[in-house]
């Protein structure tokens, strides 16, 4: 029996729409992510689901992304003339769906990593990552890697998708604390994409390029202040903030508390705030708990960058 954990991720990081993503883990040691267990059985295939958010999953197993990941992986095995083994997959669904924390990516990554290890790793990291992107595309409508890449590989990942590479890891600031606040409401990726304009002004395009280029440069040259200052979003946040509760007010409030940058995690509704120390992170977390959460399903976690990514649990 093998259990694989895949951590939560925050895509875009304000400045890198569809091109940046970061894996995160709570500093208290709790698991913010999905777990998939795999074990051999006598015959056939079985899929079971447990966990706090299991009630949010599709009722039909064929619509479960874990099942679809199993089917895709099996198809790729057949192309290599490898025998399909009878097995059971159990998804522990700990991530809220439509949260902006890479919920579907967690399930996809944990499943494919578990299957690859179960079959003695017939596929390379890039081959597995390509499958992950394809499965993400089935949910959001287009292939993208900004959640699955950091969830799988850890760290901050920049999507390059050229010269045989899907992504490259960026050097980052390990002293930063990531405060993640999920308000307890759902925003679908498809809905969040539909609200974006079909075209952008020349000035917005120039600003976006300047911000992203400067951010990447600042990461490589270890300029914290410049990196934080350039975490600005002219592509998605001005349009998506209408989907989030009291976003502008909350964003200003955490800035006043001393956070370096804040924004929408992925397509929302989770919000992230980056703090330079634990004291400011704690103050920001308390404020967000009292002013951003909308119901009992909401939560706030103080996190650090998860540099490991998907891994086996002992």
UniProtKB/Swiss-Prot annotation:
It is found in: Cytoplasm. Its EC number is 2.7.1.39. ATP binds at residues 96-106. It is an enzyme of class 2 (transferase). Keywords: Amino-acid biosynthesis, ATP-binding, Cytoplasm, Kinase, Nucleotide-binding, Threonine biosynthesis, Transferase. Pfam families: GHMP_kinases_C, GHMP_kinases_N. One of its GO terms (biological process) is threonine biosynthetic process. GO terms for molecular function: ATP binding; homoserine kinase activity. It comes from the Bacteria. InterPro entries: GHMP_kinase_C_dom, GHMP_kinase_C_sf, GHMP_kinase_N_dom, GHMP_knse_ATP-bd_CS, Homoserine_kinase, Ribosomal_Su5_D2-typ_SF, Ribsml_uS5_D2-typ_fold_subgr. GO terms for cellular component: cytoplasm. Pathway: Amino-acid biosynthesis; L-threonine biosynthesis; L-threonine from L-aspartate: step 4/5. Belongs to the GHMP kinase family. Homoserine kinase subfamily. Catalyzes the ATP-dependent phosphorylation of L-homoserine to L-homoserine phosphate. This is Homoserine kinase. It comes from Histophilus somni (strain 2336) (Haemophilus somnus).
């Amino acid at each position: 029996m093998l259990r694989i954990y895949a951590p939560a991720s925050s895509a875009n990081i304000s400045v890198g729409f569809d091109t940046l993503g970061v894996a995160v883990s709570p500093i208290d040691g709790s698991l913010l992510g999905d777990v998939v267990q795999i074990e051999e059985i006598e015959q056939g295939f079985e899929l079971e689901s447990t966990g706090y958010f299991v009630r949010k999953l599709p009722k039909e197993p064929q619509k479960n992304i874990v099942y679809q990941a199993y089917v895709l992986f099996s198809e790729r095995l057949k192309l290599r003339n490898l025998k399909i083994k009878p097995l059971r997959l159990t998804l522990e669904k700990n991530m809220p769906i439509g949260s902006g924390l890479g919920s579907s990516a967690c399930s996809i990554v944990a499943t494919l990593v578990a299957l690859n290890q179960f079959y003695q790793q017939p596929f390379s990291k890039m081959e597995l990552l390509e499958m992950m992107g394809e499965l993400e595309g089935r949910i959001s409508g287009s292939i993208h890697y900004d959640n699955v890449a950091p969830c799988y590989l850890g760290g901050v990942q920049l999507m390059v998708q050229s010269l045989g590479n899907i992504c490259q890891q960026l050097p980052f600031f390990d002293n930063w604390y990531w405060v993640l606040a999920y308000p307890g409401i759902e925003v679908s990726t498809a809905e969040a994409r539909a609200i974006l304009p079909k075209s952008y002004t020349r000035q917005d395009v120039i600003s976006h390029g300047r911000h992203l280029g400067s951010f990447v440069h600042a990461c490589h040259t270890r300029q914290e202040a410049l990196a934080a200052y350039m975490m600005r979003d002219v592509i998605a946040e001005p349009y998506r903030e209408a989907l989030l509760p009291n976003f502008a007010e909350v964003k200003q409030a955490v800035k006043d508390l001393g956070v370096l940058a804040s924004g929408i995690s992925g397509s929302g509704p989770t919000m992230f705030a980056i703090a330079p120390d634990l004291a400011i992170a704690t103050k920001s977390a308390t404020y967000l708990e009292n002013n951003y959460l909308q119901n009992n399903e909401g939560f706030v976690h103080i996190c650090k960058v998860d540099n490991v990514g998907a891994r086996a649990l002992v």
